[in-house]
Amino acid sequence: TRNHMSQLWKERTYAKRMQRKERHKGKTAGKREEGDTCGAVRSSYGITSAPPMVQVRIGSQQRNLLFDTGADRTIVRWHEGSGNPAGRIKLQGIGGIVEGEKWNNVELEYKGETRKGTIVVLPQSPVEVLGRDNMARFGIKIIMANLEEKRIPITKVKLKEGCTGPHVPQWPLTEEKLKGLTEIIDKLVEEGKLGKAPPHWTCNTPIFCIKKKSGKWRMLIDFRELNKQTEDLTEAQLGLPHPGGLQKKKHVTILDIGDAYFTIPLYEPYREYTCFTLLSPNNLGPCKRYYWKVLPQGWKLSPSVYQFTMQEILEDWIQQHPEIQFGIYMDDIYIGSDLEIKKHREIVKDLANYIAQYGFTLPEEKRQKGYPAKWLGFELHPQTWKFQKHTLPELTKGTITLNKLQKLVGELVWRQSIIGKSIPNILKLMEGDRELQSERKIEEVHVKEWEACRKKLEEMEGNYYNKDKDVYGQLAWGDKAIEYIVYQEKGKPLWVNVVHNIKNLSIPQQVIKAAQKLTQEVIIRTGKIPWILLPGKEEDWRLELQLGNITWMPKFWSCYRGHTRWRKRNIIEEVVEGPTYYTDGGKKNKVGSLGFIVSTGEKFRKHEEGTNQQLELRAIEEALKQGPQTMNLVTDSRYAFEFLLRNWDEEVIKNPIQARIMEIAHKKDRIGVHWVPGHKGIPQNEEIDKYISEIFLAKEGEGILPKREEDAGYDLICPEEVTIEPGQVKCIPIELRLNLKKSQWAMIATKSSMAAKGVFTQGGIIDSGYQGQIQVIMYNSNKIAVVIPQGRKFAQLILMDKKHGKLEPWGESRKTERGEKGFGSTGMYWIENIPLAEEDHTKWHQDARSLHLEFEIPRTAAEDIVNQCEICKEARTPAVIRGGNKRGVNHWQVDYTHYENIILLVWVETNSGLIYAEKVKGESGQEFRIKVMHWYALFGPESLQSDNGPAFAAEPTQLLMQYLGVKHTTGIPWNPQSQAIVERAHQLLKSTLKKFQPQFVAVESAIAAALVAINIKRKGGLGTSPMDIFIYNKEQKRINNKYNKNSQKIQFCYYRIRKRGHQESGKDQPRYCGKGKEPIVVKDIESEKYLVIPYKDAKFIPPPTKEKE
């Protein structure tokens, strides 16, 4: 056994180290070969050419023991009996479990130091070793990684241009936390992972610590500022490996790299930026400063540097072992093979030896040898794979906070690749209030949906990929989602997944989107192009492609008879048999109107609230409701015409009117859709336009009955049982609204049947412009109470023709209109502005106040316009962010913000609220300085405030600001309120941009439209927009500069000082400081004093000229 162990030592790095010494003879000390890099970062060490042996006295005997950091116990072959026997002990060794004698309180002596320790007597041991138990007592450390021959490659990292590193002060910490940090830091310094920072390294990053459940402290570092200033690296690995892409193997081993980050050295020139400070309790001593020598936890580039390093280290080894399936993600390594178990283990051992040369270890206790093996959240079995957690938590009826619901859904979503079921009702619950503590109501439908997923997770298993077989992907329409399954054999899925429905995409378009995602997944995981199975018929898909409804098809595809929920193509751009319905709708006259005229002579019209687009769609909806199974539709709305031809499925349409239209349309046999331009003299189109434009007698509600032609009035119906006390008057509102013609007025009169019982109608005149609810005022003249039952005809409505005559003046002629000095106002003037306001709102989506001020309509009418806008309902303007900010004319704030996948640079003038924004490629200093020149050329600013971002704080930026004469200040670090004005501008711009983006192809155009809406269309309390205020202030400044220049000049005067009884002689040439009707201030040249002189005692003269010498 001894010979076998010595042979192992010779085969490893120690023998290579000896050979290397021979090769390097004669070289200058400290010189490396070209291309060499530094080794793993460790504490100071000495190099030995063989396993280190030391002399230790055990009891009364001197022994030669081997240092072995891999051994827990100190082992000797025999012992003379000193100390206390502690019975038998079982040890786990390479050859299995062995048993030895344990002795406590044995005296040990090493280098003159004596300690009491524990030993194990094992006669059959091939070598006597000093284990970690007693090495710790003597403070002995040995790091085998320092004996490596190969060097870890270094990845260069740097700060962004113009950045100087973080200078964030350390916040106070409790004494308990400082003690915990001191213990952690001392250990890291001993292990060589931290170094003491020199005084001229001024960067600082805050540290703190938390106590783990075990009671130990864990150090945390706030690298946010350093991460912000550090140049990014590309990601070496773009995603997690998936078990569905693994091939089935007989043997697997899962390995974990120990201390992965702490083994890789940090690029030396960068280390000074990682400094941090350990405070001294009560400031009893100076603070201690440290820096990182290795990759720190929490630093944004640690994963990338680690991945690049491992890729470079393992590349050669992987190429030398093509017979295995090898996978690595961060510090987890997967090795699978079909080799014999002995050969498989040899390869694993070879890998451990290989990476040990670089200082990495693969701890034995973290190895998983064989199935089942846990890897990256998955559980691998010989034939199938599962998730490590097989069960989802329960979901019960009742209330749940949004925060808890999000966590539950998160548990499910990442398991979709094995469940493959959609949860539309649960996802719907997450809409609405974004407050994490807001509550949601769980009902039976949600519980059933969740339980179906739980059951599927417990039953479902994934399979492994076979490289010799084709891969298939089958798509199907699920519950408001596209579900697909990837397999090689029927009934044995590799994985499944769900693509939730995408708004405003047809069913075929959604299926193709899911097919693209499926294809991408298969290519990434298996390297093969899958054969896609689409639901439906091949001729349908080929027609969709020809029509241009879809633009991409998989390379290999076919169809299967699946449930597609694909709507029949019954909406066409051709004339079909059946009547033709000419539809129109819009704000034609004060209120919205819609209707249609049929080629058979039928007509329909009604009043309804809504925008022009909504009323156009409602007219089509009414025509479809009342039309036959085969019919033609003609509209002058291009928007409605194109929508109908798209033939979307109602379940994916966001607009409720559009969804209702498609639901009705898909039940018809055939519909021919046609478009004609409006107001072009086309007879039928002009007829329907005129028909709905007329003011017609229209009612809303069921509180009135039709009348016969010979009847005088319309009977009104009592809405509910009403009791009127004797001698009392009661106002009874009924379910009725009227829209009278211009030439009509109405009167509510008493029915004779009610008058006979002593109940009369009082007053009741209805003007032609009135459109509110009808109320009937009843008087009971009896001495007893009267009960009017529900549904009783209790009054009548009589229509009258309106007549209007001018009242001639009495005496002197005067002009006046009711509403200025009369009694009340008719409101006839602002009503005409409502259609204009609505039209303008559909373009720019102003708020109610802006519409109210610009179009001079009532605030309530403006609010109705905004509330009826579908776009404004979805995108509410954000609440105001409060904060102390400097405001002033020509003083600006600037900051970057992210909108979807683009970056915006936003400027805001703090006095007027004027916003200027541009799309930028990134947050680099150079691009920011280019945008500064654009901004300066447009607005001529005086001062600017920004945060401490690298682009703003860079030295070239500061020099540019000085050159332009712009006073530049930065906000308070870690205090978002110092940038409150621009932060609010971000939210306002994003909410406005969301409204305009669907209307434009280019996002730059949407940004420009949003700025018009914010700066020009948005009105303040005095009816002025931000642009109005900005231009006014600029003009005021220009006028002041032009006309007040003389007031700044020095003027001269003679003056006199009045005293009691006489006048004193005047002084000549005092400097003049102020002028006006009030007293003036002058400076006497002789006395150098300032005096206050009445204006009448001063005589102003031109400035004196200097005499020539």
From Swiss-Prot:
Residue range(s) of DNA binding per entry: 1051-1103
Domain Peptidase A2: 63-134
Protein name (database record): Pol polyprotein
Biased amino acid composition, Basic residues: 16-29
Note: This protein may be synthesized as a Gag-Pol polyprotein.
Keyword Hydrolase tagged: yes
Region annotation Disordered: where it falls in the sequence: 16-38
Sites where the protein binds Zn(2+): 841, 845, 869, 872
Zinc finger (Integrase-type): 832-873
Species this chain originates from: Caprine arthritis encephalitis virus (strain Cork) (CAEV-Co)
Gene: pol
